[in-house]
Every structure is written in structure tokens, then in C-alpha cells.
Amino acid sequence: MNDLDDSTDEVMGKYTVIALFGLDNRDNGTYESGNSDTIMLASINNDSKEVKLVSVYRDTYLNVKDDTYAKMNSAYQRGGPKQAIEALNTNLDLKITKYVAVDFNALVETIDLIGGVDIDVTPQEVAKINEYSGEVAQVTGKKNTTLSGSGVLHLNGVQATAYARIRKLAGDDYKRTERQRTVIEAMITKVQKSGVTTINSVVDEVFDDISTNITPKQMLSLASHALSYKMVDNSGFPFELKTKNMGKRGDCVIPLDLETNVIELHEYLFGSDTYTPTDSVKEKSKQIINDTGYTKETEAVKIQ
């Protein structure tokens, strides 16, 4: 964890930031390793209960361990949630301590327990949901039901998880992270309509199916405020980016540059206009520039 200045510590102390990891593991309940294909930060304003979600693109080229630079999703593979959190904290000047990790089974089970979610889907997305839902059903042992129509549809756990996996349409992985945030928002909307009793019941049911360092008591405390949470915005990180093939590490998302993007992240998450990047972030930013040749002056990709 980086040595942040007092003013940054004070600002961040007014928020609770939880790291959310979605693992693309086929073995249910295996959380020790695996690439985290979903990496999300949930920032909760402790006073206003306003919530912002930020997806860290899985292919973002960052320092994942020691002096190794690679795709961010490999940090979890290299050391589980502890290493993934360490990578988030040191690259982004954060002080995350809490996390929740889910696999296919945990996500499907949670969505089914709250009675499904309503999501606005296009005909192209419906076709992909039907294409992907077979594998999700097979992995989780759930029934596969074909979805028809388009527009606002009611999705069960298998269908919503398949929707969150869609990548091979316009927008590629960037759009996929948006779909993942849409599912999270739809789940929050649904549980808020269900009431505290349902929320507590869901927590009791799924707690053993997830990986987290949040205690049951802390989880119930968070759940008790669920009716007060207000989803105000969501986005993806890096904000300014370009892709580049990095040899053995494959096609990576390059922040333009890391230092500039981290400043914007702190402003976005915490409303901070006084944050100054630590020397650690500045050094990592310079290393990424050296490795890629991309700077903040490089023309950024326009995300669809």
C-alpha cells in the first residue's frame, strides 16, 4: 500500500471502497486462483450512501507483482485476492482492504434468490445470451431456458450471468464491463424493492458460496443500509486508453498515462481536487511509458 498524504487519507476516509472480483473458473467454489475477468470497485459515500461503480478493464497493463507488468486480471492468478488488492492499491493509490469474489455459481444463485433482474437487451444481446447460457447452466447445474424478444426482459440467474459475459459484439470487452455494471445495478434495484428481510435471507444463503474477508456481521451491517444506497454513476478505468500488443502478454489496454488516469479516478470516486499521485504511482506510470511508448499525448481509443 502506498504512503498517501494526510489530505488524501482524510478524503478517502469518508468512503468505503470494496473490490469485486468475478472469476471465470469452471470449478465452483475455487477462489484461491484464476484470472479475475471482472474487476470492479464499489465506492460508497459513508454519509450520503451514494454509490459509484468503476470497472478496471481486465487487460489493463499494470504492475501486477514485484517488478512484473502484465494484464491486471493476472494479479489474482499470481496470488489470489490478496495480490489482486495489492495491485489495485499500489497502481491506483487506494487503501482497499475488503473484497468479495464470486464465480458463475455464486452469481447465478444470488440472482435467482432475489427473483431475477430486469434488463434492457437488444436482439443481438438476446442471441448471445442464448448462445452463452448453455455453458453457464452446465457449469452451475441449473436449467437452461431460451430467451425470446428484446427490450426490457426479466432474466433469471443463468441468463443474467450469460448477459454479463457477452464480449463479441460492438464495444468488445469495454461494453462487457458496462453490462456487468448493469447487472450489479439491476441487482441493487431489485433487492431495494424486496426489503431488508429478503436482503438478510440472501446474505445468509450465499455467504458460504462466495469468497470474502467481510465478516457475516459486517455483511449484514452493509445489507442493513441497502435501502439507503443510491446508484449515482458508473464508469470504466482507464478513462483515456489505447490498446497495444505486448508480445507474450498479448493485447493490453494501456493507460494514457497512468498518473493522469489515477488523478481522474480519485476525482471520480472521491470528488477530490487535492489528490497528488505518490512517487510509487509516478514510477509505475513512467515504466508503462517506457514499455509501450504511449504517453498522455497519444491519441486515445474512442470506446463505443
Predicted regions mapped to residue ranges:
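Entry/capping segment at the start of metal-dependent catalytic domains
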Residues: 1-48, 221-224
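C-terminal solvent-exposed extensions
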Residues: 2-8, 15, 209-304
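Flexible, polar/acidic helix-loop-strand segments at domain edges
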Residues: 9, 112-195
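Extracytoplasmic
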Residues: 13-16, 33-39, 48-56, 67, ...
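Second-shell loop/turn segments in exported
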Residues: 27-30, 70-78, 93-98, 150, ...
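Extracytoplasmic/secreted envelope proteins and their assembly/folding machinery
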Residues: 38, 69, 81-89, 104-108, ...
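Flexible, solvent-exposed short loops/turns enriched in glycine
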Residues: 52-79, 123, 133
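Amphipathic, coiled-coil-like alpha-helical scaffolding segments used for oligomerization/assembly
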Residues: 78-142, 215, 219
